Amino acid sequence: MAKDIKFSEEARRSMLRGVDTLANAVKVTLGPKGRNVVLEKKFGSPLITNDGVTIAKEIELEDAFENMGAKLVAEVASKTNDVAGDGTTTATVLAQAMIREGLKNVTAGANPMGLRKGIEKAVVAAVEELKTISKPIEGKSSIAQVAAISAADEEVGQLIAEAMERVGNDGVITLEESKGFTTELDVVEGMQFDRGYASPYMITDSDKMEAVLDNPYILITDKKISNIQEILPVLEQVVQQGKPLLIIAEDVEGEALATLVVNKLRGTFNVVAVKAPGFGDRRKAMLEDIAILTGGEVITEELGRDLKSATVESLGRAGKVVVTKENTTVVEGVGSTEQIEARIGQIRAQLEETTSEFDREKLQERLAKLAGGVAVIKVGAATETELKERKLRIEDALNSTRAAVEEGIVAGGGTSLMNVYTKVASIVAEGDEATGINIVLRALEEPVRQIAINAGLEGSVVVERLKGEKVGVGFNAATGEWVNMLETGIVDPAKVTRSALQNAASVAAMFLTTEAVVADKPEPNAPAMPDMGGMGMGGMGGMM
């Protein structure tokens, strides 16, 4: 396919048009008075959102060179979202400002490599200063503030803070769509996995259709149980203890299942059988997790154990087990704290090494189940369109909160970027490097300016006043007042601000050092199909 090539100024100008188109669509959403953007969907109702990365991913421009510029800035939003989970609009605004300022200087004759060095120096200094001024997040109220600012909804802030308090900072918090209008929190304490009872005859509560076992023994194996003789020795020991039994096995079938059900119905003993969760290596790991949590052993041939040799000592114990048609929940396992901590450490190490997003998610789930539980935020709304928009906002708030727990918080509303202004301005440099530093200084003002513009105010006036204020004092665009941002609870996670700045600078530096752009030439329209008027179907009647 033939290629279209543009050089130097012409190439950069074409790409800049794409950058501006995308950034202008995204930046209207910034701040407490930011607006929404409506995205057309091929199927279903349009999506209304103020999430920067969602908007950026949807934008596709007709001109190939403009589209490349737009895609570069979309990459800033996407990367920031991957690292910090929020701050994508801020990252886009910063990138646009750096690219625009940088191009002015390149056009005026500045050396792009010198500018790049200056930009990199300035960002390193800004990130160091952000670390210095960030404060660790303390208590439920701080978490609620971070989440409420991100979602622009205090109720969501409270929900997320409560969820994190209940399941711990490492706990898994998932989002589900609710059938109702309200958004509510549902916390599953203990370890839950998605396998239900092998037979409905095993239930103990016919109203709720669930089996509840108090202080049960737990037999954990990766084998199929089809012959009752295999588990008879251990069954007899459990019956003598007068306790119920939960069997977790690859499968319980045939004669073994029939015998267990008959004895359960006769009242000889209380037993529930469930299939082991997961598949393959993940199943082995999850069975091991359950064993450590309940203080039992996995009875597996890999360790030279068979079911006939199992004793009460090799079984796990728990305070309570609830088994429904679809889920099994083990609460208050009696495993030793040291072993559980060691297992958590092991999973954390695997989390750091894995590159697969799917594996990361599964490891995070296992970690949460061992560390305390799973919280589910059920998102409700009046219409499907509102539901999708609300879900995106809560997802951002959740990511923001996790980022705040990791690296602390800084003053929100773009104030923290202005607070590092003096530090960046004090860097000693000459020539094009100094110009590169000035490009970053100009970009640091941009988020505050845009927040003010979206609130219907003159951005430059707010920026100039902010330069003279003490660290931490900023402009609350929601009320139009000047306040101490940290004390008022208008905060951003340091990680989000840092990621936005670093990613914007990275793409801007690459953009400015571009000298040629290559794109596919658009193909001429394909000729239309020839007229088929002479091919009437009348003569084919005899084929019917």
Swiss-Prot record:
Q: Which Gene3D superfamilies does the annotation name?
A: GroEL, GroEL-like equatorial domain, TCP-1-like chaperonin intermediate domain
* Gene Ontology CC entries for this record: cytoplasm
Gene Ontology molecular function terms on file: ATP binding; ATP-dependent protein folding chaperone; isomerase activity; unfolded protein binding
Residues that coordinate or bind ATP = 29-32, 86-90, 413, 476-478, 492
| Sections of the chain in a coiled coil | none
Does Lyase appear among the keywords? no
Reaction it catalyzes: ATP + H2O + a folded polypeptide = ADP + phosphate + an unfolded polypeptide
Query: CDD domains given for it?
Result: GroEL (cd03344)
Keywords, ordered alphabetically: ATP-binding, Chaperone, Cytoplasm, Isomerase, Nucleotide-binding
Q: Does the keyword Chaperone apply?
A: yes
> Which EC number(s) does the record attach to this protein?
5.6.1.7
Q: Name one GO biological process term.
A: protein refolding
Q: Where in the cell is it found?
A: Cytoplasm
Report quaternary structure and partners: Forms a cylinder of 14 subunits composed of two heptameric rings stacked back-to-back. Interacts with the co-chaperonin GroES.
Its biological purpose is as follows: Together with its co-chaperonin GroES, plays an essential role in assisting protein folding. The GroEL-GroES system forms a nano-cage that allows encapsulation of the non-native substrate proteins and provides a physical environment optimized to promote and accelerate protein folding.
What family is this? Answer: Belongs to the chaperonin (HSP60) family.
Q: Mind telling me which PANTHER family this protein's record contains?
A: 60 KDA HEAT SHOCK PROTEIN, MITOCHONDRIAL
The protein, known as = Chaperonin GroEL
Which species is this UniProt entry from? Bacillus thuringiensis (strain Al Hakam)
Taxonomic classification, please?
Bacteria, Bacillati, Bacillota, Bacilli, Bacillales
